[in-house]
UniProtKB/Swiss-Prot annotation:
Domain of life, per lineage: Bacteria
GO cellular component, one term: small ribosomal subunit
The encoding gene: rpsT
GO biological process, alphabetically ordered: translation
Coiled-coil regions listed in the entry: none
Name under which the protein is recorded: Small ribosomal subunit protein bS20
Record-stated family: Belongs to the bacterial ribosomal protein bS20 family.
Organism: Prochlorococcus marinus subsp. pastoris (strain CCMP1986 / NIES-2087 / MED4)
Cited function: Binds directly to 16S ribosomal RNA.
A Pfam family assignment: Ribosomal_S20p
Alphabetic keyword roster: Ribonucleoprotein, Ribosomal protein, RNA-binding, rRNA-binding
Gene Ontology terms for molecular function: small ribosomal subunit rRNA binding; structural constituent of ribosome
Gene3D superfamilies, per database record: Ribosomal protein S20
Length: 97
């Protein structure tokens, strides 16, 4: 355990940041899963409403990934990799009919 005041404060700050980062990462995973679920829904029933739902969920996921990269929660390469994987899956679903 830390002995001086500044070390104790750093422990508190690190714990606070860890929880915030965990929240961001969890939300990124959730939005990714929702996007993939919407793609499956579109594959089963291709119509314009489901297509719009897929595009909206992709935009939300990309936006949150970009924000996480900007706040150094994710490394920029990791964020680009996540976006690339989502984009590849969505592109495959939207082009295959």
């Amino acid at each position: 355990m830390a002995n001086n005041k500044s070390a104790k404060k750093r422990i508190q700050v690190a714990e606070r940041n860890r929880l915030v980062n965990k929240s961001y990462k969890s939300t990124v995973r959730t939005l990714t899963k929702k996007t993939l679920a919407n793609c499956e829904k579109y594959k089963q029933e291709p119509n314009s409403d489901n297509k719009d739902l897929v595009l909206v969920s992709v935009n939300q996921a990309f936006s949150l990934i970009d924000k996480a990269v900007k706040k150094n929660v994710l490394h920029k390469n990791n964020g680009a990799n996540k976006k690339s994987k989502i984009n590849k899956v969505v592109k495959d679903f939207l082009t295959s009919k």
